Amino acid sequence: MRSIMINTIQLGQRYLETYPNQKKLALFMPDYRLIRLVKQAARFMPIFACFAILWQYFFTDPTQSILANAIITSLFAISLPYQGLYWLGKRANTPLPLSLLDWYQSLKQKLISEQKIMQDQAVPSYQDFANLLKLAEETWGDNYFNEL
């Protein structure tokens, strides 16, 4: 169970790094917004966790047992980026829906015609689609995404 969770988080990290940073993709999939939130959470949640503990420690009555609540809140705040990575890892292995499959096939045919890829994928997943979008970004730059 533990190794499955770690592998899923690693898949989410790979999906996060592969997915192109194009704002227009937010119109088609929620992944762009979630990836931005995960990156911001990874940056700011440790600071928030430290602040929550210090605030409760220094500014509350020491006779109250509020420090335990602050620690639980901090642990939850620190876990938020990992929850996002876990969701992205699950999403990366999910097969593409029919609504995105046509876009995947047309993009794949364009890249094959320019001899950028040769492989054939039986059941494309979101990770495969992110790989194609990243390759399209590297090949054509922002021009491809401006056409969307």
From Swiss-Prot:
Subcellular location: Cell inner membrane
InterPro entries, per the entry: UPF0208
UniProt topology in membrane: Multi-pass membrane protein
Annotated keywords: Cell inner membrane, Cell membrane, Membrane, Transmembrane, Transmembrane helix
Residues spanning the membrane: 41-60, 66-88
UniProt keyword Lipid metabolism present: no
Keyword Membrane tagged: yes
Pfam families: DUF412 (PF04217)
One term under GO cellular component: plasma membrane
Family: Belongs to the UPF0208 family.
Designated name of the protein: UPF0208 membrane protein HD_1715
Organism: Haemophilus ducreyi (strain 35000HP / ATCC 700724)
